C-alpha cells in the first residue's frame, strides 16, 4: 500500500472497502478494493478468488474493467482496478427524465459488447445490474464486480447456486431454484437493464422472491410447460401456484419505446433461457442501425460518484407509464396464504 496515496472512499462491497487512490510514482489514479480476512485460517473469500480468476482469464477488453494488480496488505489483500468515475445506476438515478434513445442505445451496445466478450470466454457474470456497470470520465461503460462470476459448463452438467444476481435482475429460472443454468441468466439481466434505461425505473422491483415472480408474470404472463418446457423440472416449481394470466404487450408497458427497441427487449425477456437472444446476435439487431444511432460515449451523461448525496431509497412498485404493476400481490396467487411468511409488515 505504500506505493499508493488514498484520495477518498468510493464505497463498500460484500468483501471490502473500495478507495480512490493515486500511485505515488506514476500518478495513475486507481480504485483499490481492500479485502480483509476475518480469520487467516478461513483463507481468501470465494467471491474474491472468482473475481481475480475471471479477470485474469480474460485478456484486456475495453468493455470489462481492468484488474491492474493484486498484492497482500495487513490481514488481507488489495485489488487495484482502473478508476472509473461513476456507474450506470448513478446515470439513471440523476436523469431528469428517461434517457434519450441514442443514449440508451449507446449504453446497451457497450454492455452487449462486454457481455459478448465474457460469454465468448465461457464466463457468466451472474450479477449484471446498473451499479456493476461502471462509467469512465470519457463515457465508456465497463462491466465490473466479477465476485459471482463462474466459468460455465457448455454441456450444462455443472451445478451452481441459485442465490445469485440482485433480485430485480434475477432470471425466472433462478427464482424457481434452478441449479443448472448458463449465460441465459446474464441475458435476462441485460433485458431488465434495457427496460430500466427505457423506462427510467426498474421493470421488476420485487421486495422478495415471490413478489419478484409476480412482477414478471404480470408482464410476461403466467409461465406454463407449453411455452417453457423445462419449467416442471425446476426445484421450486410445485411450491407455489399462480393464477392464469395473459402477457401484457410490451408497447403498453413502454409506450414511448420504438418498435425496434421493443422487439429486441422481447427477445431478452423470455421464459426459456435458451430462447433468449445471444449478446453477439443482439449487437446485429436492427435497433442499433435505425435512427437515432447510438450516441458517442463523449455525448453521454457522467454524474460524479464522489460528493453526490446518497440517493433516496426506491419508493417501491412504480407506475410504469399507463401500465400498473402495483396491484395487491394476492391477486396473482392461487393460494395467498403461501406468501404470508415472506411479507414484511409495515
UniProtKB/Swiss-Prot annotation:
InterPro entries: CDK, CDK20-like_STKc, Kinase-like_dom_sf, Prot_kinase_dom, Protein_kinase_ATP_BS, Ser/Thr_kinase_AS
Leader sequence segment: none
UniProt keywords, alphabetically: ATP-binding, Cell cycle, Cell division, Cell projection, Cilium, Cytoplasm, Developmental protein, Kinase, Nucleotide-binding, Nucleus, Serine/threonine-protein kinase, Transferase
Positions of the Protein kinase domain: 4-288
A GO CC term assigned to this protein in UniProt: nucleoplasm
A Pfam family: Pkinase
Localization per record: Nucleus; Cytoplasm; Cell projection, Cilium
Documented EC number(s): 2.7.11.22
Recorded catalytic activity of this chain's protein: L-seryl-[protein] + ATP = O-phospho-L-seryl-[protein] + ADP + H(+); L-threonyl-[protein] + ATP = O-phospho-L-threonyl-[protein] + ADP + H(+)
CDD domains: STKc_CCRK
A single BP term in Gene Ontology: cell division
Top class in the EC scheme: transferase
Function: Required for high-level Shh responses in the developing neural tube. Together with TBC1D32, controls the structure of the primary cilium by coordinating assembly of the ciliary membrane and axoneme, allowing GLI2 to be properly activated in response to SHH signaling. Involved in cell growth. Activates CDK2, a kinase involved in the control of the cell cycle, by phosphorylating residue 'Thr-160'.
Similarity field: Belongs to the protein kinase superfamily. CMGC Ser/Thr protein kinase family. CDC2/CDKX subfamily.
Name the record gives this protein: Cyclin-dependent kinase 20
Amino acid at each position: 500500500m505504500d506505493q499508493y496515496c488514498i484520495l477518498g472512499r468510493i464505497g463498500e462491497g460484500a468483501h471490502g472497502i473500495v478507495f480512490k487512490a493515486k500511485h505515488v510514482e506514476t500518478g495513475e489514479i486507481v480504485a483499490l478494493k481492500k479485502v480483509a480476512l476475518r480469520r487467516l485460517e478461513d483463507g481468501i473469500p470465494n467471491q474474491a478468488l472468482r473475481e481475480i480468476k475471471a479477470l485474469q482469464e480474460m485478456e484486456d477488453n475495453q468493455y470489462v474493467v481492468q484488474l491492474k494488480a493484486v498484492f497482500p496488505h495487513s490481514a488481507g489483500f488489495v485489488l487495484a482496478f482502473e478508476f472509473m468515475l461513476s456507474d450506470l445506476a448513478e446515470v439513471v438515478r440523476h436523469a431528469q427524465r428517461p434517457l434519450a434513445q441514442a443514449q440508451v442505445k449507446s449504453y446497451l451496445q457497450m454492455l452487449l459488447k462486454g457481455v459478448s466478450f465474457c460469454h465468448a470466454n465461457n464466463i457468466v457474470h451472474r450479477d449484471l445490474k446498473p451499479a456493476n456497470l461502471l462509467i469512465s470520465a470519457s463515457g465508456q461503460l465497463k462491466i465490473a464486480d466479477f465476485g459471482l462470476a463462474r466459468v460455465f459448463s457448455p454441456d450444462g452438467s455443472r451445478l451452481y447456486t441459485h442465490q445469485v444476481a440482485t433480485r430485480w435482475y434475477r432470471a425466472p429460472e433462478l427464482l424457481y431454484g434452478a441449479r443448472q443454468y448458463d449465460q441465459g441468466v446474464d441475458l435476462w439481466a441485460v433485458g431488465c437493464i434495457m427496460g430500466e434505461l427505457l423506462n427510467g425505473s426498474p421493470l421488476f422491483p420485487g421486495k422478495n422472491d415471490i413478489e419478484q415472480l409476480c412482477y414478471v408474470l404480470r408482464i410476461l404472463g403466467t409461465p406454463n410447460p407449453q411455452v417453457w418446457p423445462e419449467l416442471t423440472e425446476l426445484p421450486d416449481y410445485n411450491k407455489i401456484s399462480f393464477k392464469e394470466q395473459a402477457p401484457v404487450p410490451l408497447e403498453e408497458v413502454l409506450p414511448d419505446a420504438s418498435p425496434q427497441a421493443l422487439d429486441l427487449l422481447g427477445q431478452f425477456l423470455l421464459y426459456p433461457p435458451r430462447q433468449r437472444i445471444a449478446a453477439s446476435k443482439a449487437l446485429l439487431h436492427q435497433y442499433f442501425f435505425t435512427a437515432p444511432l447510438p450516441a458517442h460515449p463523449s455525448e453521454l451523461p457522467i454524474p460524479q460518484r464522489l460528493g453526490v448525496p446518497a440517493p433516496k431509497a426506491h419508493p417501491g412498485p412504480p407506475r410504469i407509464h399507463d401500465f400498473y404493476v402495483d396491484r395487491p400481490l394476492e391477486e396473482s396467487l392461487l393460494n395467498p396464504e403461501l406468501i404470508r411468511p415472506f411479507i414484511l409488515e409495515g
